[in-house]
C-alpha cells in the first residue's frame, strides 16, 4: 500500500493532522487505513527512553510494524518525530512514500521534549508545512492533494 509519514518536532501537529487526514480519507474511500502514532507506540512498548539509542529502537519497531501493515494492504499514516533521516528513508524504496515535514515557530506546551538532534528532511520530494500559518483543514488539504496525485500513479 502506501506510507504517509508526518514528521517534525513535538507539538508541530503530527497527531492532530494524522487524525484529520484519516477522517478525510475514510469519508471518501473504502480503504484499510491506520495511524501509527509515536505516543501510542511508546505506550505499547513501555519505551520512555529518549536517548538516541531509545529513539532508534522505537522508530525501528515502528518501521517493522509499517512494513507488516503495508504488506497487508493498509495505508499507514505515521505521526512520529523520527529525528533521524536514515530511519525515515528506510521504507522509501519499498512502498509509495509521502514524507511530510511539519514545523512551526509556535510553542505548544511540549518544548521540554524538543529533539535537539532532529534532522530536517533533505528530500526534495518532502512536503513541508508550517502548521503555525495554516489551519488544520488547510494543512490536511495540502497533504491530501499530494496523496491523491501519488495514489493515482501507484
What are these regions (language model features)?
Residues 18-64:
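Conserved substrate/cofactor phosphate-moiety recognition/catalytic segment
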Residues 4-6:
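Hydrophobic anchor at the beta1->P-loop junction of P-loop NTPases
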Residues 103-154:
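Small-molecule kinase domains that catalyze NTP-dependent phosphoryl transfer to phosphate-bearing small molecules
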Residues 1:
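Catalytic phosphate/metal-binding cores of nucleic-acid and nucleotide-processing enzymes, i.e., regions
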Residues 44, 52-107:
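Glycine-rich phosphate-binding loop used to anchor ATP phosphates in small-molecule kinases
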Residues 10:
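The conserved Walker
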Residues 14:
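Conserved lysine of the Walker
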Residues 33-35, 97-101, 126-128:
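Conserved beta-strand scaffold positions in the cores of enzyme catalytic domains, especially
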Amino acid at each position: 500500500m502506501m506510507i504517509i509519514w508526518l514528521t517534525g518536532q513535538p507539538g508541530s501537529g503530527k497527531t492532530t493532522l494524522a487524525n484529520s487526514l484519516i477522517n478525510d480519507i475514510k469519508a471518501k474511500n473504502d480503504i484499510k487505513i491506520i495511524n501509527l502514532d509515536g505516543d501510542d507506540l511508546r505506550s505499547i512498548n513501555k519505551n520512555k527512553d529518549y536517548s538516541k539509542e531509545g529513539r532508534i529502537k522505537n522508530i525501528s519497531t515502528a518501521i517493522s510494524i509499517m512494513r507488516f501493515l503495508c504488506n497487508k494492504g493498509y495505508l499507514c499514516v505515521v505521526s512520529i518525530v523520527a529525528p533521524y533521516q536514515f530511519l525515515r528513508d528506510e521504507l522509501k524504496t519499498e512502498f509509495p512514500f509521502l514524507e511530510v515535514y511539519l514545523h512551526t515557530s509556535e510553542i505548544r506546551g511540549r518544548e521540554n521534549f524538543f529533539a535537539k538532534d532532529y534532522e530536517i528532511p533533505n528530500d526534495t520530494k518532502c512536503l513541508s508545512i508550517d502548521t503555525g500559518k495554516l489551519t488544520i483543514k488547510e494543512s490536511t488539504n495540502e497533504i491530501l492533494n499530494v496523496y491523491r496525485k501519488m495514489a493515482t500513479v501507484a
